[in-house]
Amino acid sequence: MMETCARRVLFTAALLVLSTVIAETFSTDSDTDNPLSTETFYSRASGLKQTSSWPGREATATAVDLSSGLGEMTEIPASVSITAAREGHSPKPLQTSTNAADWKTSTTSDETTEHLQSDTELTHNATAQWESPSSASHSITSHHPVTETRTVRDVTDLIDMDTTDSVSHTDSTYISTTNRVGERTLLSVISNSTFAYTQNSSISDAESQTSPWEEKTSGATQVNEETEETVSTVSEQTDPTFEGRNTTSATLETERSTLSQGTESQTGQPSVTGQTAKEVTDIDNPNSTPPLTVTSRDVEETDATSVSSETSYTQTSSDSASSILPFTSSEHNVTSTSQESHNSTLIYSTNTGGSTEFSTGSVSSTAHEETERSSTRIVDETTLHDVTSAPPVLEDVATTIDDSLSKFPSGQSPTIPKTDDQTNTQVVPTSTHRPQVTDEATDEVSTVYSSTTTLTTTTPSVTTRQLQPHYTTVQTQTQHTTIVTTDIIQVLRTTPSTAHHVPTLTTSGPQAPSTADSSDVTTLHLETSTATPGNTTAHGGRATTPFSKSSPGRTTVVVTTGHLTDKSTTETGSATTQMPLRTSASPGHVCGPKTCANGGHCVRSAEGSYYCQCLSAWTGPFCTEDVDECVNSPCPQGSVCVNTGGSFSCECDLGFDLEDGRSCTQVKTFLGTFTVNNSLHLRNLGLHELHREIQQLLNASLSIFHGYRRFTLGKRDGQGVQIPVVSMFSLSSNVTSADVFNSIQMSLNNCSRTYSHCPIKLQHQLSYHVESLCMAQKTKCDVQYSDCSDISGIPNCQCLPGYFKRNPEDMTCRDCGDGLKLVNGKCVECMFGFGGFNCNNFYKLIAVVVSPAGGALLLIVVIALIVTCCKKDKNDINKIIFKSGELQMSPYAEFPKSNRVSMEWGRETIEMQENGSTKNLLQMTDIYYSPALRNSDLERNGLYPFSGLPGSRHSCIYPAQWNPSFLSDDSRRRDYF
């Protein structure tokens, strides 16, 4: 038994040692056997990263190398531009330019005049008939933007932001294209005066006029001014008796095509009368009307009139013939067909006293509309009265005509012979582009439709002198001559109408074709004489149109008209217009309004040649080459110079704005995109209107926030038209991305046709959504520990829960480390027993608390086991003696008991009787075996009742009697007999 107990004690000691080892393993100072291993490596993406590890655990700390990583993390390729305006140029709009997420935009053309200068050529077919029926027609194909027709009397001052047009004092028709606030105005003029190539005309002795004209070349719009000297001398003497007789009236009725939207028409009736004259239209007086064909065309690369159009006057006379003059464009040679949509009839009436003869010429013009253009067609017409207006001679073409009505000897100045009767002669300067004369015989009566232009002139007998250069005064014998001019200009929308009956026209006089090379004047001479109605004298022949080339720089075109009566003599002055002619030393470089582009001026050198004096932003022989201003680095530090047509712009990175043109400062930036879902009919002009409405919407939506600076618009192609928007606020503003979106969305939801910014939105289903500034700037946040957020208008790397940044501008986040926890942005220590990241681990609690408690419990269990084992060995005899409450039977039960006691210690002497008198003589404690004696005696005599260990069934003779003081010792055993 002792050996068994020893083994158990050793086992208990081993368990104690094991528990001690376990406790040391989980304790804080148990890492001495496992040294910490540290590994450091550098990554370009995340910076310097250090990893510390030991068996079973690993902790990582990341630090950013600002010296190398910052360049990549702050790389923001997107940009916003501001275009700097230069002197002499129209201001360029602000630009937005980015190179991330298709935010790159560029706006270099002026919004106002982008589509005002049409590239479409006007091609004319002119047909004139001088015999009965007398008619002239021409067809015009043109394209113009939406225009507004006004007269001088209706509009006293046209002011649109930075453009102001002076008021005209003569009867002129202004055709102006008026845009909204902040945009420019293109002004076209139709003038009925003696001043060719002018806009603002007035009859005076000498006047210097300025004609603004606009030109768009290479995306840049420049405003040029050209000064013309106009000298006009008109002497008038009026007799009250001839007020109703000597009156000139003109009526213009025009029908415009209404296929394009947004056309506005205003009608006025200006009237200019001399002395006490009144408006008279006498249709009962005999008339003599020379036919007049008025053509207009736009010239893209050659010189033009004050509104970039060339006006050509053509008068022909033939016997039952029509003169067709095809006008050939410098770029296109397209002849439009005549349609019944835009006609005009010109009727001249001349009062000759008692005569009742009259002749009428009609002019019909037809406008053929281009299907791909949707804007109002405009025909620049110039009416002729006693004082006529002619455009500058753009190309000098020598034309040889045979069989003419008027003959001039070669080398002599052309003269105008007098007719037999009272003659009304019109001298019209004519400038055409390579005219070709074609004769056709026709006797049909022409019926024209659409707009009608009627010019009625009532004058006495006229004697016209020869054209004189420069200032001319013509002495005529006139009695009580009165010059009264009354112009009535009416612009009406009418239905097609039929022209008046055209009487015959009679021509007479010497006829000779001539080309006067020595003449300095390009003229068209026409002689007419009246006859009684019904009697027509037809003379076959061709119209004579002499042209001449002249080397002088200026040519004076003199138109002199005299009126004759029978009583008095009046000296009538002449109106003189001096116009510069295009003369150049080299045939390829001539001086004209469009010779020098982009605001350049044509200057004549001392040698007689012409050259272009360009503005500082342009260069080249024709001022068409842009100067790269970015070579001189004009932009401040931090911005990028972008060269544009005629200027340059300084662009800051996206998220920055140019502050006072000096430096790029950081601003709050919010990105968004307007999407036009229905862009089927959206053309360039519609896109311009869409931009204007979006600007109004953004100004109304964003100006309510504090710190609002500006916004920029761009264009991005995709499914539908997409217009990116960059809205900028100052850093002091507390606006957020949600505020901007809600304000714009509210404006769109409240949109109706009563608002100014809504028609396009309702038509094209305009919508707005927010774009990510983080994606546009490619902000490099550490995706493992942070997320990019642009809610405040500034890209910010928002740390995940449990991480923090030492500086707000840092791109990476870090943790507090082991044993610390982030609380309100500060790192605090963990509670007892907790550690790890953000105090989420409790291994310390296990090592410090659980391990000792477990060891103590194990020790208690071991002690209890030892005690239990020892207690079991002591109580085993009870289980041997007593078993289920039954007595053990002695092997000597057959022997009778004796009640007698022998005094001898031997077995033979002891007797016991069974009677009751001697039964209790022996007590349980009276009989003892002598251990030595007993053992020796029993073993010697062979009477030992058992041979086994104590506790066997042979341990006692009489099982019913047992000594309770028996010890488990072989030397102390007692038997009962």
Curated annotation (Swiss-Prot):
InterPro entries: EGF-like_Ca-bd_dom, EGF-like_dom, EGF-type_Asp/Asn_hydroxyl_site, EGF_Ca-bd_CS, NOTCH1_EGF-like. Keywords: Calcium, Cell junction, Cell membrane, Developmental protein, Disulfide bond, EGF-like domain, Glycoprotein, Membrane, Repeat, Secreted, Signal, Transmembrane, Transmembrane helix. The gene is heg. One of its GO terms (molecular function) is calcium ion binding. The lineage of its organism: Eukaryota, Metazoa, Chordata, Craniata, Vertebrata. Disulfide bonds join 591-602, 596-612, 614-623, 630-641, 635-650, 652-664. This is Protein HEG. Residues 93-110, 200-212, 244-296, 325-366, 404-435, 499-538, 545-563, 570-586 have a biased composition (Polar residues). It comes from Danio rerio. Residues 587-624, 626-665 form the EGF-like domain. GO terms for cellular component: anchoring junction; extracellular region; plasma membrane. The chain crosses the membrane at residues 846-866. The keyword Zinc-finger does not apply.
